Amino acid sequence: MLAGYVLNHSDCDDTNTLVHPNAIEIYGNGIDDNCNGSIDSDTSICGVSTIWNGTEWSNGTPTYEKSVIFSGAYTSTSDIYACAILITNNATLTLNHTLFIYDAITIDNGSYCIANNNNNIIQINPLATNTGNLMVHRNTSTIVRLDHTLWSSPVSGQNLYAFSPETLTHRFYTYDTLTNTYLSSTLSNASEFLAGKGYAIRAPNNQSANIPAEWTGFFYGVPNNGTIPFNVIHSPSNYFNLLGNPYPSTLDAELFVNDNEATIEGTLYFYEHTLTMDANGIFPTGTNYATWNATGGTAATAVDINHPDYHTPSVIPNGNIQVGQGFFVMAKNNGTVNFTNTQRTNNQDHQFLKTLTEQHHIWLNVASIDGNDINQILIGYVEGATMGLDVNYDGKSYGNTGNHLYSILGNEPLVIQGRALPFNATDEVPLGWFCDTPGNYTIKLSDWDGIFLGNQAVYIRDNYTGTTTNIKTTPYTFNATVGTFNDRFVVVYTENLSELSHDLAANSVIIYQKNNKFHVSTPNTIMKDISVYNLSGQLLYHLKNINSNAVILNKMGVSDQVVVFHIILQNLQPIAVKVIHKTP
């Protein structure tokens, strides 16, 4: 028998239809000895209590079995475990550690409970009703005046404008899924944070414009607890929704996604202020979003060299959604997501990794020629992923402006791609590249783990130049023109794989030079386009809408050098062939 409970060996009231005819009641700790089988409001599920009077405990230190009463000031020196909490007699409880509590938190008028930055309140009973106001402190990363942060409140009753009173009122925003816009017009002086909803809030107007510094937000209200539903929208034009952690504790991203897999896809997007919006509301090239799913996470690596904090590296999400943090999800349909107490966790600092499962990751960054990273993508070989599109393991590319790299699965551009185990060195992963500014760029490995910690190489094959580069040892620099290129780059793991299609033999392409003209033919199929590049990736010649299996190219206008013919067939299959161009 559990401590604090006894058996009533008398048969319960058989006339009560709510009680089984042969029931014998277990009573105590919240159940009265009246055979009605219900928990009465005038009873407590907690057994004994202990009181802190400002100097000492009346009945030993707090445990899960005790109702803990603070009638004097107390500052935590370690984690606190309690069945219930009462703060009374104008006392102040300051939490510098985690509070684990089974039942309710009661804070009398004139008393205070303060949860400092990076501390959790883990509440178990989803039906427990909290009363009184909790103050939660949350520090931002270093920000300047024009930076925005996505916030969500861990308490109810927090006025939106009062949260950051020095922020201009028209710089508080909600996100509208139907129009894909941030709106300030829907908010007013009476607006309060809604539980589970994310808000974009600019830094206070008295924050320095050029010296980055942390800013501390103060939430004040009744701590949220229990199941919190939030409606999401999937429209024909957009399915991104801005949510937020509604609890005064860290949220386990994997549990949240798994519990709501019928309603949302598995990738979460976290806004980072790595890029500064200009006066016209436009962001420079790059991405402001870090991402996470079951495969792993990517950083918002893009930086604005004009941002005072541009040298500070962005953090890769680790599967923990912090207190007060807003984030984007993709809705599969119109429906409801549920935040629950079982998703709450005390995991603060440790990387979220399934250490008992096999996994192999590579993180690729693309950078401008001056070395500034533009964006980051992840390819991971992990348990649970397949070679098809998996919404929990493949994350769609989102929030990019200007030049950016992505991997491709089917026709879907991805920032995270999960691949099936076991790892096979013959695997190939196509990459896509969007360029709006011509010039030289570099693809490099940012990090790797698993099998890649050993001798397994990672190559970038450039179909336009016909080169294959081991980027574990040497970043690959290429020249790019404006456009979208989904057939140029491939990640491979074996250097000598055929540069031609596996379905098309090399001798199916015939290229020869005569009188400064190139004769190109594909006897077995029709050509659509031909582009000719030098080994630096510069476009030398382009011919489109060929619709023939033979063509003559003249007036190439280049000196003696190796060039690469990049041929697109009628079925959109690419072929790359190196040819030596000789001047007659």
Indicate where each model-derived feature is located.
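Short beta-strand segments and strand-loop junctions that repeat across beta-rich extracellular domains
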Residues: 27, 46-58, 168-180, 271
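Membrane-associated feature with strongest affinity for ZDHHC
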Residues: 1-47
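Low-complexity, Pro/Thr/Ser/Gly/Ala-rich linker/spacer regions in secreted
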Residues: 38-51, 494-503
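Acidic, glycine-rich segments characteristic of secretory precursors and extracytoplasmic regions
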Residues: 88-180
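Extracellular beta-sheet-rich ligand-binding/adhesion modules
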Residues: 45-128, 182-183, 187-188, 196, ...
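Conserved structural position at the C-terminal beta-strand
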Residues: 567-569
